[in-house]
Design a protein with these regions (language model features):
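A short, N-terminal "cap"/entry segment at the start of jelly-roll beta-barrel domains
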Residues: 2-93
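Short, conserved beta-strand element in jelly-roll/cupin
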Residues: 112-127, 131, 201
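Short acidic-glycine-tyrosine-enriched beta hairpin
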Residues: 131-184
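Short beta-strand His + acidic residue motifs that chelate non-heme Fe in jelly-roll/DSBH
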Residues: 127-128, 181, 186-192
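Catalytic micro-motifs at enzyme active sites that drive phosphoryl/nucleotidyl and oxygen chemistry
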Residues: 71-73, 104-110, 188
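Conserved short histidine dyad/triad with adjacent acidic residue
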Residues: 95-110, 129, 133, 183
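A short hydrophobic beta-strand segment most commonly corresponding to one strand
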Residues: 117, 194-210
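Long, compositionally biased interface segments
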Residues: 208-264
């Protein structure tokens, strides 16, 4: 999927954003995405964006911005990572994902939203990308395809028959890397040997995209009950403090890179 970089606002890495609301972050997201259909990459690696996010996180930590909605929307995902929703507006959402060592996705899947942009803030995220294949290809494997559909406040799973997938590429997305994928990109996060944290923006879900695809080796007869474990206030504060440190480190990386470019210019 092609990406387009937007340099506006990235020229002044020393600029410190003073506005502490998620609205300031949201406006920066819209500036990069251009349109609400998620046509362009959100430059999460841009110093101005990172500083807006850090200012907002600091306001959450010092109590000047409310955390009620964040606490309500965030939980520990069954695949072994903390999913912290920092804010949502006009179809866009910004999240912090913290992966525990040794935990990974239980299935191959795609997404409902039109696009995902992700900046690795800590560790290296091993990701296995797959593609549809013909049964007679030597590296093809048979998988059971399911549609995972949202129905009101609940989800239902429908078996759609077998299909064949083959490995496309296995990538370790490293610290400081910004990567993107569209709704149809099949992937699976593999277990990491170290803690991993990513800052993620999901783009609006198309009106007709009420499902995503899940692929497993067995047929899922019915969804197992999912008990979403909510973060305690103490866990949330610890993760936000950790995020603030990671954002500061990312700003320092940007400054180092800018200095290096200046030296070699």
């Amino acid at each position: 999927m092609g990406t387009k970089n937007h340099e506006a606002g990235c020229e002044h890495p020393d600029f410190e954003e003073k506005t502490a609301s998620f609205e300031a972050v949201h406006q920066r997201i819209l500036l990069d995405a251009k349109t609400t259909d998620g046509a362009n990459q959100v430059r999460l690696d841009c110093p101005q964006m990172i500083k807006k996010v850090r200012t907002y996180v600091r306001s959450l930590l010092n109590g000047t911005s409310p955390m009620d909605e964040i606490m309500e929307l965030s939980y520990i995902h069954k695949n072994g990572f903390q999913k912290i929703v920092l804010g949502r507006k006009s179809g866009f959402a910004m999240r912090l994902h913290r992966y525990l060592p040794g935990e990974g996705d239980q299935n191959v899947h795609d997404h409902r939203w039109s696009r995902l942009d992700s900046l690795v803030l800590e560790g290296s995220l091993p990701t296995n990308y797959l593609a549809y294949s013909k049964p007679n290809n030597c590296d093809a494997e048979k998988w059971e395809r399911h549609e995972y559909c949202k129905a009101g406040d609940d989800y239902v799973v429908k078996h759609q028959g077998e299909t064949y997938l083959a490995p496309d590429v296995c990538v370790h997305h490293s610290t400081g890397e910004l990567y993107s994928m569209d709704a149809k990109r099949l992937h699976r996060i593999l277990p990491a040997t170290e803690p991993v944290a990513t800052l993620v923006v999901t783009h609006p879900v198309p009106a007709e995209r009420v499902w995503c695809n899940l692929y497993q080796k067995r047929i899922i007869e019915e969804l197992e009950p999912v008990h979403e474990v909510r973060l305690t206030h103490q866990q949330m504060m610890a993760s936000l403090k950790h995020l603030e440190r990671l954002l500061t480190q990312q700003i320092e990386r940007c400054a180092t890179m800018a200095t290096s470019k200046g030296v070699w210019a």
